[in-house]
Amino acid sequence: MEKFTIYKGTSVPLMNDNIDTDQIIPKQFLKAIDKKGFGKNLFYEWRYSKDYEENPDFMLNKPQYRKASLLISGDNFGSGSSREHAAWALADYGFRAIIAGSYSDIFYNNSLKNGLLPIVQPKEALKSLAQLSSQEEITIDLPHQLIQTSTENFYFEIDPIWKDKLINGLDDIGITLQYEQAITAYEQKHQ
């Protein structure tokens, strides 16, 4: 998993509440088990027509937001069915963090497990962040748990264990590999 320490990027506002996992990545695209390739179908029903033509009114299709790597959204992001593919699609598209009012618990944990930082902020902060210019960089400083713009700073909470995993780029396999010598020694001793 890629390390997440201090990240700078531009944002796209998608200020809907209750964006569910089927809206993030519809079920017809869940046939693969590889994490790559889901980004092209992210928000499929909103981004494309049935003929796969781009909807010019959807935020991600607007030229000024095409390179955004931070998503600003409303409450209850990632609700609905449990599908890790939703986090995969967001990450594969290029998002590194989501800043929203709240998340479903399963989506929140799936995001963290895949190196995608879900940040909770109050409505006032979300409104301020959503109004930023599409060209203004936002800095996310994970070690200091801080979102910085050119004019404001917003503090955020994160579990210290998840914070450490993200800063060190450790997924579950990476954590296990830290104990590889001890595991090998145990296996040799108990053959």
Swiss-Prot record:
Picking any one GO biological process from the record gives:
L-leucine biosynthetic process
- What S-S linkages are listed for this chain? none
The record's listing under SUPFAM superfamilies reads:
LeuD/IlvD-like
MF terms (GO), sorted A to Z: 3-isopropylmalate dehydratase activity
Q: Which spans of this chain does the record mark as coiled coil?
A: none
Which PANTHER family would you find in this protein's record?
A: 3-ISOPROPYLMALATE DEHYDRATASE SMALL SUBUNIT, 3-ISOPROPYLMALATE DEHYDRATASE SMALL SUBUNIT 2-RELATED-RELATED
- What family does this belong to? Belongs to the LeuD family. LeuD type 1 subfamily.
Query: What is this protein called in UniProt?
Result: 3-isopropylmalate dehydratase small subunit
Q: What is the lineage of its organism?
A: Bacteria, Bacillati, Bacillota, Bacilli, Lactobacillales
